[in-house]
Every structure is written in structure tokens, then in C-alpha cells.
Amino acid sequence: MKTFFLLVCLPAIALSQRPSDIAELVDSWAVTYGFEPELIQAIIEVESSGNVKAVSGAGAAGLMQLMPATAAAFGVRNRFDPAENIRGGVAYLAWLRDLFAGDRRLMLAAYNAGHGWVLQHGLALPSAPVVAYVDRVAFVFRRLRWERVLREGGSAL
């Protein structure tokens, strides 16, 4: 009876924000743009902790914390819509990957600090917050990869 009550009373938007729905969106867009789903999941975890309604002090919003100009450039009209946000965020990440010739550290630094900053400074001018961001995403990415290996019956040793 409780399940029926929850399904009837929850707004439709809440059903579209289930973790399994978000994981499906991540998997789909990651594959479309040639990324490992765990990388996109790691960015989401670091950027918003999976909160579809997250807003930063700088004005970034949604799961992948898109700034208004970035969202507009990649066709995202509603930054709080998980499907649009993930699609736009992954498309932006692919653009950054191409801009920085596949260098993941520069790609992630640019996702965090902006591509203009990285084009000007690269990682030669260490910015503690930017380096910490890149390291945090890399750490979460590795953790998620190991979790997948274990879930699929592999061994961590």
C-alpha cells in the first residue's frame, strides 16, 4: 500500500530524477560522446553531489553545474532538467576534449575554471582550487571504475 501511495502522490518530475534514470542518461550521453560513464558520474558527484537543483555561488546550475552562457552555447534551455543538463554538459566536455587534444587534466581544469583560463595559464600556473578539482574528479572516477569491476564480478586485486 505504501508503494502505491508514493507513486500516486509523487509529482511526475520526481520520478524522472530517480538515480537509475540519471544513470541511464549518463550512460547514453557518455557513449554518444566517447566518454566512460564513470567520468561523467564523477563530474556530477564533484560538481553537484547529484542534486538536480544545485546552484553555485557563481551561477552554475544543475547536475553538471552549467553556467548560463555555456548552457546556451550547447542548446540547454532548462539547466535543471537532468536530460538537458547532462546532454549539454557532456557535449561541452567533448568540445573541451577536442580543444585540448585529449588531455584530460586540461579538459577537467577547463570544465572547472573555464577554457579561457586554461588556454592562458594551462596547469603551469597552479591554482590550488583547480588542481584540487582535477584531482577530486580523478579520484572519484577511479573509485567508480573499481566499483563497476567489483559489481561485474571482477576482482579488485
Annotated model-derived regions:
Residues 9-11:
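N-terminal signal peptide c-region/cleavage motif recognized by signal peptidases
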Residues 15-157:
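Catalytic glycan-binding domains that act on GlcNAc-containing polysaccharides
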